[in-house]
């Protein structure tokens, strides 16, 4: 992956647009284009009590996710990145797509306040590496500073 180029492209894509939905929509489409072996990428936005489906690319998804459920809920509740090599081994996993095997979820935080999560699923086991995580942390940093600030 050409990480620095992708980061510059995303920054350019979102920096002059103020609409959050438009920016998150384009970000999910952008990630869907550049990431291999994924079957879902998108956002869940925190409404103060639960995660609500936001812009995404992939099959129809669960609309409401309580913070006590699933990989997304765990990442949101603990405000930390979680990589799951095998979602079927994750207690409380919410199976929106039975084809998903691994998942990475990154919280979106502004001044330590939860705004939502970036969720990416793959049909491959152990799809997401530490390199992917570090790259996606940079993506989330752009989201936090260019979209939610």
Language-model region placement:
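Intrinsically disordered, low-complexity terminal regulatory regions
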Residues: 1-54, 138, 143-149
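Regulatory sensory and allosteric helical modules in signal-transduction proteins
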Residues: 46-96
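Regulatory loop-to-helix N-cap segments in sensory/regulatory domains
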Residues: 121-139, 146-149
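Short hydrophobic/aromatic beta-strand element in the GNAT-like acyltransferase core
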Residues: 40, 105, 117
